[in-house]
């Protein structure tokens, strides 16, 4: 029985790794890995992006064009390309830079097995508790837009929900597991990341850790 259990656990872990490998898009060889699964550089600067609000009428793919042209690892606009993500008109869009004024929690999810939809119920409940102190963004990856819009209404989510139609943000952030969480300091640098389903108490504890880390950083 113990051997059978070990085999099952091993297969589950292998499946997680395979899914991560399939969904992760590496860059130019620097800093490759899966967010929440592999070690990220300290205070990694979250790349800019803008996505349509899931319940809105704005159509189109995510804008992942960056302001910083010194980096070749992320898309950087030239004069003939679209405006950087954080400079587009805000109407109908969620610009991640607008969320950098407070500590930030981003929940990346897709509806391909597991309990990722139910996990967003947990995220929404914690969002309501910390609203005004911590910013939250629930980011759907590549699901049907109408289905996501219906989910928001049916489940009564109040948190901001963005729509990454073509998976560009997922690739930029190296998301390979559902759900994936990114916890960021004000200003948009990574404090920590995690993968897998968690309950409201554990997510609240992670948010409290983020708030405490933010206070320490502000004092230093």
Residue ranges and their predicted role:
Residues 105-106, 136, 181:
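Hydrophobic beta-strand anchors of alpha/beta hydrolase catalytic cores
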Residues 132-147, 157-167:
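Thiol-based oxidoreductase modules, predominantly thioredoxin-like and allied folds used
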Residues 101, 150-158, 165-219:
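Thiol/disulfide oxidoreductase modules built on the thioredoxin-like
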Residues 50-104:
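A short beta-strand-turn-helix
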């Amino acid at each position: 029985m113990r051997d059978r259990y070990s085999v099952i656990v091993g297969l589950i872990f292998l499946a997680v790794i395979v899914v991560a490998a399939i969904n992760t898009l590496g860059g130019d060889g620097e800093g490759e890995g899966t967010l929440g699964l592999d070690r990220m550089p300290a205070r990694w600067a979250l790349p800019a992006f803008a996505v349509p609000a899931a319940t809105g009428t704005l159509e189109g793919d995510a804008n992942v064009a960056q302001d910083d042209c010194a980096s070749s690892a992320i898309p950087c606009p030239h004069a003939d390309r679209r405006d950087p993500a954080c400079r587009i008109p805000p109407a109908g869009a969620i610009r991640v830079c607008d969320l950098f004024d407070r500590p930030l929690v981003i929940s990346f999810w897709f509806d391909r097995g597991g309990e990722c939809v139910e996990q967003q119920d947990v995220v929404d409940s914690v969002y309501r508790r910390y609203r005004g102190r911590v910013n939250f963004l629930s980011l759907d990856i590549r699901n049907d837009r109408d289905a996501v819009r219906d989910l928001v209404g049916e489940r009564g989510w109040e948190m901001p929900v963005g729509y990454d139609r073509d998976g560009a943000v997922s690739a930029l952030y190296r998301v390979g597991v559902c759900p994936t969480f990114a916890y960021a300091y004000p200003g948009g640098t990574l404090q920590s990341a995690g993968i897998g389903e968690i309950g409201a108490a554990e997510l609240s504890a992670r948010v409290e850790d983020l708030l405490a880390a933010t206070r320490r950083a502000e004092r230093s």
